[in-house]
A protein has these predicted regions:
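Conserved beta-loop-beta/alpha segment of the NTase-like Rossmann-fold superfamily
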Residues: 2, 12-15, 24-113, 157-159
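A glycine-rich beta-to-alpha transition motif near the start of alpha/beta enzyme domains, typified by
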Residues: 9
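Catalytic-core segments of class I nucleotidyltransferases/pyrophosphorylases
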Residues: 66, 80, 84, 116-174
Length: 174
């Protein structure tokens, strides 16, 4: 479905022809600009985010990479840009977070925070995947934006399945 959104040239050409809307033309031009940079990988069966990330290894060339999970909708134009700026400043991994109600922590990966380093940034000691309310170290939840080092692939490759029989990216981050 996502692949069709980006690569369905016939759809966009028909839409442009029918609507003649400059916004649609501009959107299509943006997609064309990035089309060669976008790669898709598929999991034959759902084995967790760690397994999905492992399948991208051959495409990762830089020391760090930005990972966006499509099931977390973040309505903020600058989330990835802000994360990249933090990464450049501290030369480290960066993970987005959001505050969640303590009663719902068992639905999320939860950060164990070490130290507040700026108004919005923390050092992270650990990530606990879907802890009980009693065992949750904070109410800062993992959301689908990460800047991770290429070395994560080595950890993922040797990792055994965690909760639900899946390979979790959060387990490899620890």
């Amino acid at each position: 479905m996502i692949k069709n959104y980006f690569f369905n040239d016939k759809f966009y050409k028909d839409l442009i022809r029918k609507k003649k809307d400059p916004r649609i033309i501009n959107e299509y031009k943006k997609i064309l600009k990035y089309k060669k940079m976008i790669k898709f990988v598929y999991q034959n069966k759902p084995m967790g985010t760690g397994d999905a990330v492992l399948k991208t290894k051959k495409f990762i060339k830089d020391k760090y990479f930005l990972m966006l999970l499509p099931d977390d909708l973040i309505i903020n134009k600058n989330c990835s840009k802000s994360m990249i700026n933090v990464h450049k400043k501290f030369n480290s991994s960066v993970m987005a977070s959001m505050r969640v109600d303590r009663a719902t922590v068992s639905r999320w990966g939860i950060y164990k925070l070490s130290k507040k380093i700026t108004k919005t940034d923390y050092l992270i000691n650990d990530v606990i995947e879907k802890p009980s309310v009693k065992k949750a170290p904070s109410n800062k939840a993992v959301i689908g934006r990460y800047i991770l080092p290429k070395t994560i692939f080595k950890k993922l490759k040797s990792q055994t399945a965690g909760k639900g029989g899946e390979i979790h990216i959060t387990d490899a981050i620890q």
